[in-house]
Amino acid sequence: MLGDGNGGMSTIPGFNQIQFEGFCRFIDQGLAEELYKFPKIEDRDQEIEFQLFVETYQLVEPSIKERDAVYESLTYSSELYVSGGLIWKNSRDMQEQTIFIGNIPLMNSLGTSIVNGIYRIVINQILQSPGIYYRSELNHNGISVYTGTIISDWGGRVELEIDKKARIWARVSRKQKISILVLSSAMGLNLREILENVCYPEIFLSFLSDKEKKKIGSRENAILEFYQQFTCVGGGPVFSESLCKELQKKFFQQRCELGRIGRLNMNQRLNLDIPHNNTFLLPRDILAAADHLIGMKFGMGTLDDMNHLKNKRIRSVADLLQDQFGLALIRLENVVRGTICGAIRHKLIPTPQNLVTSTPLTTTYESFFGLHPLSQVLDRTNPLTQIVHGRKSSYLGPGGLTGRTASFRIRDIHPSHYGRICPIDTSEGINVGLIGSLTIHAKIGHLGSLESPFYEISARSKKVRMLYLSPNRDEYYMIAAGNCLALNRGAREEQVVPARYRQEFLTIAWEQVRLRSFFPFQYFSIGASLIPFIEHNDANRALMSSNMQRQAVPLARSEKCIVGTGLERQVALDSGVPAIAEHEGKIIYTDIDKIILSGNGYTVSIPLVMYQRSNKNTCMHQKTQVQRGKCIKRGQVLADGAATVGGELALGKNILVAYMPWEGYNFEDAVLISERLVYEDVYTSFHIRKYEIQTHVTSQGPERITNEIPHLEAHLLRNLDKNGIVMLGSWVETGDILIGKLTPQLAKESSYAPEDRLLRAILGIQVSTSKETCLKLPTGGRGRVIDVRWIQKKGGSSYNPETIRVYILQKREIKVGDKVAGRHGNKGIISKILPRQDMPYLQDGAPVDMVFNPLGVPSRMNVGQIFECSLGLAGSLLDRHYRVAPFDERYEQEASRKLVFSELYEAGKQTGNPWVFEPECPGKSRIFDGRTGDPFEQPVIIGKPYILKLIHQVADKIHGRSSGHYALVTQQPLRGRAKQGGQRVGEMEVWALEGFGVSHILQEMLTYKSDHIRARQEVLGTTISGRTIPKPEDAPESFRLLVRELRSLALELKHFLISEKNFQINRKEV
C-alpha cells in the first residue's frame, strides 16, 4: 500500500493480474463461444447427425503437480470433457456420451504455462483495431489525396480513395482499383438503391458513364467486373456459382469480416445504427464511408491518428488461446466428418466417443506454445525478469508489424501512452519502440482497450472516486498533471495547475480540473519504477537500466538496497520466488527442503525449492526464514528465494564506490575493484548447467548406458557408477565422462584392424562393433554434480527415447571481464582486481571497493546515481533504509538534494566524522592513495550505491581456437564459440597489421590460419619434424572462390607471367 497526502490510500494491483484475468476470461467465456460455433455434422445421406451439447462442459483437475510436470518434462494441463450425441434421423434415436476433447494447458500461480517441462508465457500483442480510418497524404504533385481504410478483424484491408475529379475508387490490392459503384453493385445494390442511400447523389452521378452503366446493369455483370479486377484475370470470365464462392472466400471472408469490435468502431465513426451481431461489412457501410470521404475532401470531419491507442486493441492471452481453440475445433470437425463417412462405408455403428479424437486439440496447443512468436520461454534470470516478461506488449507477431518495416512514427512515444505504456522501458536494437512494457496500473478492458486509472474530482461530493478510462474517453477530460498531487485543500482554489486536454498540455485553474493522476509510478513500468531518482536521469540511460536490472544474477548472499523506491516488496511477492504462508498457524518443523505448519485442525507441509536451474542457468533456491515454534500470520514470508531478502527484491550489493580516475584502469567504462569482493564472496553467484543425452533404438539395436567403455583412459571414467552414470556429489572437470554410452554399428570385414581379424581367426573372439558416444563435459563446465534425472517417456518406442540429464553446480566469483552495472545505466567491465591495501581509502581508513570513471556521469546525464551514492553512504552510517518515490520535486524545489544533504549532515554529526559532509564540497571527501598514503589532489565523490552483477560473464564468453571445423565453400574457420570457431581478420584488421609492418604474421593470418588448404596441411608435418614451414605458392581458396563467381558472370580471369629475358608471354591459368 502506498498513499498520498490528499488521495487516501491506493493499492497497487497484482503484477500478474493481466495474465490471470485473460486466462479466466478464456476459460469462462472463450471456450463456450467457440464450442457454440461447432456445427451439426451429417453424413452424405443425411441419416446420422452428430452434435455437441455445450451447456455441460467440464475441465478436470490435473493428475500431476506443477513441480512433477517440470521434473518429468510433461505438460501441466487439464482434460476437457463435453457432452456429445449421435442422432439417427430415421428412428429419431439419440445416443449421448461424455467425450474427451483434448488437453488444455493451464496457467499456474506465476501467470505462466508449463509445456513439456518448460515454463512458457504468452505476451500481449498490439494490433490496429478493426474499423475505418481516414487519412490524407500528398501525392507527387503536392496535392492532398484523401483515403479511407477499412481494416477487417483478420487484418485484411480495403481502401477507398477520392481523386481530383471527385471520383471514388475502391482499391482491393496495391495495383488494382475499381469504382465504388461496381463494388456496391457486386454487394447486392442497384443504382437506385445506391443513390437513395448516399448524401451526395450528384457526385455519384457525375462519374457514371455509359461504360459504367453497363458494368452495373446487373449484379452478375458487377460481380464479373469485380472478379476480373480483383484476381487480375484477362479475357471474359463467365458468371457461375463457383466464381461467386471463390470471390466469397478470397475477398468477402478475409477483408469484410469486421468482428464485434470492428462493428462498434464502424457504427461510432460513421454514425450508423447497424446491430452489433451483424459483424460483416455491408453495402450501407461502404456508402456511408464514401459520404464521409467526400466530406473530408471538402473540409468536413477530422482525420484519424493511426498511432493513437484508441485505434489499437490488445490481443491478450485470452484472444490467442481462443483463436487456437477455434482452429482445433475446425480440425476436429474435419476428423469427425471423415470418421462418420468411413464408418457408414464399412457398415459400422459409430458412437460419439469413437468419432472424436483428442489429437487436434492437443497438437494445436502444443504447436502454439512451441512455435508461435508470442509464446516465449519465460525468462527466469531473477524475480524481476519473471514479472516483467508477462507484462510486455509487442507490435510484432502474426497480423502485426516487423522490425524491418516499422516506421519511426509507430516506434515513437505517443501522448495516449500516458499511464498505459511505459515511455522508457523498451528493447534496444531493431525492435526499439515495438516491444514495450505496460505501466503498473494499466489493465486490459473488455474490448481489448488499454485502460488507466484516475481520481475523479467532484465539487458536489467530497468523496474521491477512482475511474478506469480507455484512451478514447480520457481525452475529453481536463486531467491534472502528476506534479499537483500534494497541493493542500486550502490552497487549491487559488492554484493554477498544469493539465492535459486532447493531447495538449495547458495551464488552467483548479476548478476546471475533472480528473487527476493518483500515483507517482502511474506512468512507468515495473523496471523503470525501481530506479531511485529517475527524474534526474536521461531517458536513454533509464531505458538501459530497466533492461539491465532484468539481467542481474542472483547472488549467493543477497542484500537489500539502502536506497529504493518502495516497490521492491511487491515485485518479490508477486514473482512467487519467496515462500508465503497461506494460513496462519505455528511452525512445528523446519528443514532445508520443507516447512511444516500446524493450524486449526490441519497440518500443511510446504516444500521448498532446492537448487533448481532457471533457463538462464541461474540458481533458484529457497532459504528458511522462520524458526520452529514461532507463530506466523497469513501472508508472512516463510522462506526467501533467489535475489530476495525479507520478502524484498535484492538484486545486488551496497558497496563503497569512489568516482575518480585510477591509472587509466577505469578508462571508457572500465571498472576497478578490490580483491575483497572476491575473497569475501560479495559478488559470488551459483550457476547450474544442464547436460543431457538420449538413448535411441537404432537399426543395429538399442544404444546401451554402461561404464565399460573400451579405448578410454580410466581417469576419465572415475566418476561413473556401475550403471555408467556420473555419481551425485562428484567433482567433474573438462573432458570427463558424465554418461557412458555405446552405439551399435555394422562393421564390415575391411574395417577391422589386423589384430582384430587375427583374434577372430585364431580364437574366435567376437570383437565389439560398438561406437563410443558418451556424454563428455565440455570446456568451461567444471563443477559439482547435484542432480541426475532419468526421464522415461511412456511407450518406450524409438520415437520416445529415454533422456538422462545431468545438472552441474558452478560457483563463480567476480573476475576480470565480468560486467557490472548500477541502476542508472552506468555499466562497466571489470578491468583489474587490486589488493585491498592498494585501493584508495577514506579518512577513517576504510578502503574503497570499486572505482568508477567520473567522466561517465556528465556526458550520459544520469545524475541520479550521484544522489543514490551519497544517500546510500548516509544510510549505511545511520543504519537506515530509504524508499524515495520518483518526482519528489512535486513537494518542493530541490527536494532530492535537500534530502541527501540533510541525511549526510546528520550522518556526519552522529558518527563524529565531519568529513562525511563538508560544506565546501558537499558529498565529496578527501581520500588517500593506498600505495603511497598521499592524499589525492581533489576531493572525490564517495558513497554506497547499489551495484549489480550481470549475466554477461567472461566465463561464458571467453574462447580460443587451436583447431576446428572449416566452412565448406570458403574453407575458412567457422564463426562463433559454439562451433569452435575462429576470430575473423577482416579488412580493417589487415590495415592495422600493415601499419605495424608485420608482413610474416599477416601472411600467416591470410594463408596458413585461414583458407590455404595445401599450406595448412603441410604446417603440422613440418612443425613436428622441425623443418622450415614452406611458403604458400598458389592462391588461397577465397581467391579461387572469387574467380569462380566471376566465371558464373561470364567473366574469365587469367593472369600472365612475362619472362624478363625475351618478354615472351607464357599463359598460366589461375
Swiss-Prot record:
<comment type="subunit">
    <text>In plastids the minimal PEP RNA polymerase catalytic core is composed of four subunits: alpha, beta, beta', and beta''. When a (nuclear-encoded) sigma factor is associated with the core the holoenzyme is formed, which can initiate transcription.</text>
</comment>
<comment type="similarity">
    <text>Belongs to the RNA polymerase beta chain family.</text>
</comment>
<dbReference type="InterPro" id="IPR007645">
    <property type="entry name" value="RNA_pol_Rpb2_3"/>
</dbReference>
<comment type="function">
    <text>DNA-dependent RNA polymerase catalyzes the transcription of DNA into RNA using the four ribonucleoside triphosphates as substrates.</text>
</comment>
<dbReference type="GO" id="GO:0032549">
    <property type="term" value="F:ribonucleoside binding"/>
</dbReference>
<dbReference type="InterPro" id="IPR042107">
    <property type="entry name" value="DNA-dir_RNA_pol_bsu_ext_1_sf"/>
</dbReference>
<dbReference type="Pfam" id="PF04561">
    <property type="entry name" value="RNA_pol_Rpb2_2"/>
</dbReference>
<dbReference type="InterPro" id="IPR007121">
    <property type="entry name" value="RNA_pol_bsu_CS"/>
</dbReference>
<dbReference type="Pfam" id="PF04565">
    <property type="entry name" value="RNA_pol_Rpb2_3"/>
</dbReference>
<keyword id="KW-0804">Transcription</keyword>
<dbReference type="GO" id="GO:0003677">
    <property type="term" value="F:DNA binding"/>
</dbReference>
<keyword id="KW-0548">Nucleotidyltransferase</keyword>
<protein>
    <recommendedName>
        <fullName>DNA-directed RNA polymerase subunit beta</fullName>
        <ecNumber>2.7.7.6</ecNumber>
    </recommendedName>
</protein>
<dbReference type="Pfam" id="PF00562">
    <property type="entry name" value="RNA_pol_Rpb2_6"/>
</dbReference>
<dbReference type="InterPro" id="IPR015712">
    <property type="entry name" value="DNA-dir_RNA_pol_su2"/>
</dbReference>
<dbReference type="GO" id="GO:0009507">
    <property type="term" value="C:chloroplast"/>
</dbReference>
<dbReference type="GO" id="GO:0005739">
    <property type="term" value="C:mitochondrion"/>
</dbReference>
<dbReference type="InterPro" id="IPR037034">
    <property type="entry name" value="RNA_pol_Rpb2_2_sf"/>
</dbReference>
<dbReference type="InterPro" id="IPR007641">
    <property type="entry name" value="RNA_pol_Rpb2_7"/>
</dbReference>
<dbReference type="GO" id="GO:0000428">
    <property type="term" value="C:DNA-directed RNA polymerase complex"/>
</dbReference>
<dbReference type="InterPro" id="IPR007642">
    <property type="entry name" value="RNA_pol_Rpb2_2"/>
</dbReference>
<keyword id="KW-0240">DNA-directed RNA polymerase</keyword>
<keyword id="KW-0934">Plastid</keyword>
<dbReference type="InterPro" id="IPR037033">
    <property type="entry name" value="DNA-dir_RNAP_su2_hyb_sf"/>
</dbReference>
<dbReference type="Pfam" id="PF04560">
    <property type="entry name" value="RNA_pol_Rpb2_7"/>
</dbReference>
<dbReference type="GO" id="GO:0003899">
    <property type="term" value="F:DNA-directed RNA polymerase activity"/>
</dbReference>
<dbReference type="InterPro" id="IPR010243">
    <property type="entry name" value="RNA_pol_bsu_bac"/>
</dbReference>
<keyword id="KW-0808">Transferase</keyword>
<keyword id="KW-0150">Chloroplast</keyword>
<dbReference type="GO" id="GO:0006351">
    <property type="term" value="P:DNA-templated transcription"/>
</dbReference>
<dbReference type="InterPro" id="IPR014724">
    <property type="entry name" value="RNA_pol_RPB2_OB-fold"/>
</dbReference>
<dbReference type="InterPro" id="IPR007120">
    <property type="entry name" value="DNA-dir_RNAP_su2_dom"/>
</dbReference>
